[in-house]
Each structure stands twice: as C-alpha cells, then as structure tokens.
C-alpha cells in the first residue's frame, strides 16, 4: 500500500512512479486525503517530479542566516543555537524534520540532555520556546524567499506555557550597599557604569561600551541597541561631570566580572539570569513608584512594544486605584 499511517503521527505516501527500479518518492502529510491526492497526482504526472531535496536542516539554517539572519542583532546567536539542535536531532535532512522530531529533542533538552555547556545542564521552557520560534522563522523566511517549497513543519506546534518571569529590584538601602561595594572594588570604572545603569535604565552592555561620541552636555545617546533604534536620555550635571573627559573612543573597560564580585559581597540574592539586568529593573520600578509616565518610561528603556513596559505599571502609586472607587459595593455603601 503506497499510503499508510505514520506511527509518529500523520500519513506517509511512498511510491515508485517509474517502476520498481526507479527512484522512490516518500513524503509525509498531515491527513490521509493529502497523501492520496499526492499519490494520484504523482502517478499521473511522473515527469513533473521535482528534483529530490537533499539539503540538511543545517544548510537551510545557513541559507536563512546568509539571506536574513545576518541582519538581526541576535542572528549569530540563533544560528549557533539551531546548529546545536541540528546535531542533537541526528543531523536530519530538512525534508525529514518535523514536529515530532523537535518535540523529542526539546523533551530531552528539558531533562538535562543535549547541554550546550557544562555550566548549564537543564534549560527552561522559555529557552526552548525561543528555539521553536527560531526554527519557525527560518522556514517562514525561506518560504517567502522561494528557497523552501514545503509547509512550515512546526507551524502547528505550540510553545510551552510559562510563568511570568520574576523581576527583582533593589531598595534604596540595597542600592547604597551595592554602590559602596563597587566603590571599594579595585576596578576603576565599575561604580560609574553601575551609576549610569541606575540613572538611565541602560542595559549593561550599552553602558559598559559607551563611547565619547555618545556624550553631549547632560545627555547620553545609546546606539546599536537591542531594538535597533538610538535613544537619548538626559542625565544629571553630577553624573555628567563624573564621566571621563580625557578619553577618546570607548570610555570604560569590561567590568562584568567585577560587578558579579561586588554584588556577591553585598549578600543580595537575585533570580537566575538577572545579574546586571536588576539595575535596569531597579530604574524602571523606582521611575514608576515616583509617579513617572509609562509612555515616557517606554521611550527611556527603548522598548518597541508597550507590553514590555507595562510589566512595571503596577509600581505606580495610583495603579488600579479606580478599583476602590468604581467597584459595585461603593454604590451600595453610599446609599445607606
């Protein structure tokens, strides 16, 4: 029988349109009807058979990177993540890659198999959702470019449900404690970089890589940002005058390790993955607690999507205060 059910899901059509000694055609389909239709068409039009696609999944990823991924801020990171997944899945041909294969891969990855480094064995569902999005984007983009003729094999695959990530911010006492440890550290640039992050909401990499050309009087302009848009943030006279004025090019040397060391000495505990990002969270949280405008905060942080900024809305002093004034019990209480 040329059309049969696939134990892993879906249907398989396998036939030899040019006889038993001719080339075999084997394709997977979501429904039996699609498989039968393909069988009928191929038998009736054997000469129209397309050349067999022997590209590996890795070759597709590399085609995507050359045509589109290279323009993305995290394009290389995506490419390397997909290369690793390709190796873990047994280096499949692109035509054999499907949702079942990726599902088995991510199940094992969640259990600590297929680790990319000895430092981190198990990965979070959020990380695997990113990898799913990466592969989907590859097939979507190559389809738009005419480099992939089939359907997106992951189009119906759902991402894992994840809890909203905990965001920690520092209190005034913790900020003072942290700045004190940074001041005592022997790295000459550490305290200044931390102050820039706390004063402007900058990402660590944006502050650490700051160049002289990005400074104007009482202003810092961040370039080459994650959102690919420049943004200018005002700073105090005190902070401006503390910045080096005798350097050309980059103002600070790398101090990530020094920050980790200073933070450890404070005893402040943070959720995983929020080592330097806590400074950005702290800026945003205090901005809203002090009555800041959410739209202004969006521009300062450089968020392209307001939903990212709305995570900080609950810090506003009057956040959801209307719930007290507009709930139905108010009318009943006032009528007594």
Swiss-Prot record:
CDD domains found in the cross-reference section: INT_Rci_Hp1_C
Gene3D superfamilies: Intergrase catalytic core
InterPro entries per UniProt: CB, DNA_brk_join_enz, Integrase-like_cat_sf, Integrase_catalytic, Tyrosine_recombinase_XerCD
GO BP term, pick one: viral genome integration into host DNA
Ranges where the Tyr recombinase domain occurs: 165-325
PROSITE patterns noted in UniProt: CB, TYR_RECOMBINASE
Top-level taxon of the source organism: Viruses
Family the UniProt entry places it in: Belongs to the 'phage' integrase family.
Protein name: Integrase
Organism: Escherichia phage 186
Primary gene name: int
């Amino acid at each position: 029988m040329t059309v049969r059910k696939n134990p892993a899901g879906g249907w398989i059509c396998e036939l030899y349109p040019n006889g038993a000694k001719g080339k075999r055609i084997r394709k997977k389909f979501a429904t039996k009807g699609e498989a039968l239709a393909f069988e009928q068409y191929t038998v009736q039009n054997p000469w129209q058979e397309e050349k067999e696609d022997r590209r590996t999944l890795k070759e597709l990823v590399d085609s995507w990177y050359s045509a589109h991924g290279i323009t993305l801020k995290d394009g290389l990171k995506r490419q390397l993540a997909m290369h690793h997944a390709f190796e873990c899945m047994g280096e499949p041909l692109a035509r054999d890659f499907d949702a079942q294969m990726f599902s088995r891969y991510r199940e094992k990855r969640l259990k600590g198999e297929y680790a990319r480094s000895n430092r981190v064995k198990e990965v979070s569902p959020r990380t695997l959702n990113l990898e799913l999005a990466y592969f989907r984007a590859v097939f979507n983009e190559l389809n738009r470019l005419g480099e992939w003729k089939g359907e997106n094999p992951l189009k119906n695959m759902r991402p894992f449900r994840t809890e909203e990530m905990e965001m920690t911010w520092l209190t005034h006492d913790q900020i003072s404690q942290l700045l004190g440890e940074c001041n005592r550290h022997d790295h000459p640039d550490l305290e200044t970089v931390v102050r820039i992050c706390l004063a402007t909401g900058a990402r660590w990499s944006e502050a650490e890589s700051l160049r002289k050309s990005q400074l104007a009087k009482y202003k810092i302009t961040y370039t080459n940002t994650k959102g690919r848009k420049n943004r200018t943030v005002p700073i105090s006279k005190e902070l401006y005058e503390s910045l080096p004025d005798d350097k050309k090019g980059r103002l600070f040397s790398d101090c990530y390790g020094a920050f980790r060391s200073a933070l450890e000495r404070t005893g402040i505990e943070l959720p995983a993955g929020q080592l330097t990002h806590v400074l950005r969270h702290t800026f945003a949280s205090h901005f809203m607690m002090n009555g800041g405008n959410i739209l202004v905060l969006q521009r300062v942080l450089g968020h392209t999507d307001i939903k990212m900024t709305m995570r900080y809305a609950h810090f506003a002093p009057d956040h959801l205060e209307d719930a007290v004034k507009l709930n139905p019990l108010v009318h009943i209480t006032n009528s007594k």
